[in-house]
Amino acid sequence: MKTAELRDLDIEALGKKLGESREELFKLRFQHATAQLEKTHRLREVRKDIARIMTVQTEKKRQG
Protein backbone atom coordinates (compact mmCIF):
# COMPACT_ATOMS: atom_id res chain seq x y z
CA MET A 1 0.00 0.00 0.00
CA LYS A 2 1.30 3.43 -0.88
CA THR A 3 2.04 6.06 1.74
CA ALA A 4 -0.33 8.56 0.11
CA GLU A 5 -3.19 6.08 0.46
CA LEU A 6 -2.31 5.53 4.12
CA ARG A 7 -2.29 9.25 4.85
CA ASP A 8 -5.93 9.45 3.73
CA LEU A 9 -6.97 6.99 6.45
CA ASP A 10 -7.79 7.96 10.04
CA ILE A 11 -5.95 6.60 13.08
CA GLU A 12 -8.54 3.87 13.76
CA ALA A 13 -8.36 2.58 10.19
CA LEU A 14 -4.56 2.61 10.38
CA GLY A 15 -4.70 0.56 13.57
CA LYS A 16 -6.97 -1.98 11.92
CA LYS A 17 -4.71 -2.13 8.86
CA LEU A 18 -1.68 -2.59 11.13
CA GLY A 19 -3.33 -5.53 12.89
CA GLU A 20 -4.21 -7.16 9.58
CA SER A 21 -0.67 -6.71 8.27
CA ARG A 22 0.89 -8.15 11.42
CA GLU A 23 -1.42 -11.15 11.20
CA GLU A 24 -0.47 -11.65 7.55
CA LEU A 25 3.23 -11.42 8.44
CA PHE A 26 2.76 -14.05 11.16
CA LYS A 27 1.10 -16.41 8.66
CA LEU A 28 3.79 -15.79 6.05
CA ARG A 29 6.56 -16.48 8.57
CA PHE A 30 4.88 -19.72 9.55
CA GLN A 31 4.59 -20.78 5.91
CA HIS A 32 8.21 -19.83 5.31
CA ALA A 33 9.38 -21.89 8.29
CA THR A 34 7.50 -24.95 7.03
CA ALA A 35 8.79 -24.44 3.47
CA GLN A 36 5.30 -23.84 2.05
CA LEU A 37 5.82 -20.22 1.01
CA GLU A 38 6.35 -19.76 -2.72
CA LYS A 39 6.36 -15.95 -2.92
CA THR A 40 9.08 -15.13 -0.41
CA HIS A 41 9.14 -11.48 -1.52
CA ARG A 42 5.82 -11.01 0.29
CA LEU A 43 7.67 -11.18 3.63
CA ARG A 44 9.67 -8.09 2.74
CA GLU A 45 6.66 -6.27 1.28
CA VAL A 46 4.50 -6.84 4.36
CA ARG A 47 7.32 -5.79 6.71
CA LYS A 48 7.72 -2.54 4.78
CA ASP A 49 3.95 -2.00 4.76
CA ILE A 50 3.93 -2.34 8.55
CA ALA A 51 6.72 0.23 8.81
CA ARG A 52 4.83 2.63 6.53
CA ILE A 53 1.64 2.27 8.57
CA MET A 54 3.49 2.87 11.83
CA THR A 55 5.23 5.94 10.36
CA VAL A 56 1.95 7.49 9.21
CA GLN A 57 0.36 6.68 12.59
CA THR A 58 3.17 8.51 14.39
CA GLU A 59 2.84 11.50 12.04
CA LYS A 60 -0.90 11.74 12.71
CA LYS A 61 -0.45 11.43 16.48
CA ARG A 62 2.11 14.24 16.50
CA GLN A 63 -0.13 16.42 14.34
CA GLY A 64 -2.96 16.14 16.81
From Swiss-Prot:
Gene3D superfamilies on file: 1.10.287.310
Alphabetical list of CDD domains matching this protein: Ribosomal_L29_HIP
Sequence similarity: Belongs to the universal ribosomal protein uL29 family.
Name this polypeptide is given: Large ribosomal subunit protein uL29
GO cellular component annotations of the record: cytosolic large ribosomal subunit
Source organism of this protein record: Solidesulfovibrio magneticus (strain ATCC 700980 / DSM 13731 / RS-1)
Keywords, alphabetical: Ribonucleoprotein, Ribosomal protein
Biological process according to GO: translation
Molecular-function annotations in GO: structural constituent of ribosome
Record has Ribonucleoprotein as a keyword: yes
PANTHER family recorded: 60S RIBOSOMAL PROTEIN L35/50S RIBOSOMAL PROTEIN L29 (PTHR10916), LARGE RIBOSOMAL SUBUNIT PROTEIN UL29C (PTHR10916:SF0)
